[in-house]
């Protein structure tokens, strides 16, 4: 039995977000094929995701120097507890399903803030004399990525820092990232929206059976 963490990184409701619609198709098929697995849904825009800021970095250094957690300011304790809870939730999962849009050739800022809660030296990777070593080698992920243009291939593929960035950072910590599902090109061809979404849903169903 596997534990799946379904991470939604769009503020848009499902009826508006095409990538979320495709992700729901993926999850429905996955649950049907793997009824004994547990699925936990994390909606980032409905979740307190603390920014890795000066306050958190200072608290981390103070704790490493021997300061007691209870000696931190109450608001810092609260922020650190929320941060650590996201870290532990991520580490406890076996599989990850990310659904996220491309914003200005990158990922949503809240998704970047979330990434910072689990890409942590000593937790998901460690430094060695030979360089960084991944620690999450027995886990897998799939990325479901939406964009108005087409960036998965062709002349604009070098412009994007969305799907390639998330794939790279997950691979850096050892996670096996299977082929992504792209929901793209609708802004270029609005008349083909239904066709594009249907094709992506078909890929999602097939991918779910193998995930």
UniProtKB/Swiss-Prot annotation:
Q: What is the name of this protein?
A: FMN-dependent NADH:quinone oxidoreductase 2
What does the record give as the function of this protein? Quinone reductase that provides resistance to thiol-specific stress caused by electrophilic quinones. Also exhibits azoreductase activity. Catalyzes the reductive cleavage of the azo bond in aromatic azo compounds to the corresponding amines.
EC number(s) per UniProt?
1.6.5.-, 1.7.1.17
Q: What does the record say about how the cofactor binds?
A: Binds 1 FMN per subunit.
Which top-rank group of organisms is this from?
Answer: Bacteria
Q: What class of enzyme is it?
A: oxidoreductase
Q: Member of which family?
A: Belongs to the azoreductase type 1 family.
Q: Which residues bind FMN per the record?
A: 10, 17-19
Write down the Pfam families for this protein, in alphabetical order.
Answer: Flavodoxin_2
Key word Transmembrane present in the record? no
């Amino acid at each position: 039995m596997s534990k799946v963490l379904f991470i939604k990184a769009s503020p848009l409701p499902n009826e508006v977000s095409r990538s979320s619609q495709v992700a729901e198709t993926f999850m429905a098929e996955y649950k049907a094929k793997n009824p004994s697995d547990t699925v936990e849904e994390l909606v980032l825009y409905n979740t307190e995701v603390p920014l890795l800021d000066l306050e958190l970095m200072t608290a981390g250094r103070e704790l490493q120097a021997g300061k007691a957690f209870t000696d931190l300011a109450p608001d810092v304790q609260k922020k650190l507890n929320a941060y650590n809870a996201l870290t532990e939730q991520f580490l406890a999962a076996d599989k990850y399903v990310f659904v996220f849009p491309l914003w200005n050739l990158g990922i949503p800022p809240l998704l970047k803030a979330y990434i910072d809660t689990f890409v942590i030296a000593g937790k998901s990777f460690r430094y060695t004399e030979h360089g960084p070593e991944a620690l999450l080698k027995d886990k897998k992920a799939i990325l479901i990525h939406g964009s108005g243009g087409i960036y998965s291939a062709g002349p604009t593929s070098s412009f994007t820092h969305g799907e390639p960035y998330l794939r790279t950072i997950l691979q850096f910590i050892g996670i096996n990232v299977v082929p992504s599902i792209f929901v793209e090109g609708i802004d270029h061809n609005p008349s083909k929206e239904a066709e594009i979404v249907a094709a992506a849903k078909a890929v999602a169903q097939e991918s779910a059976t193998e995930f």
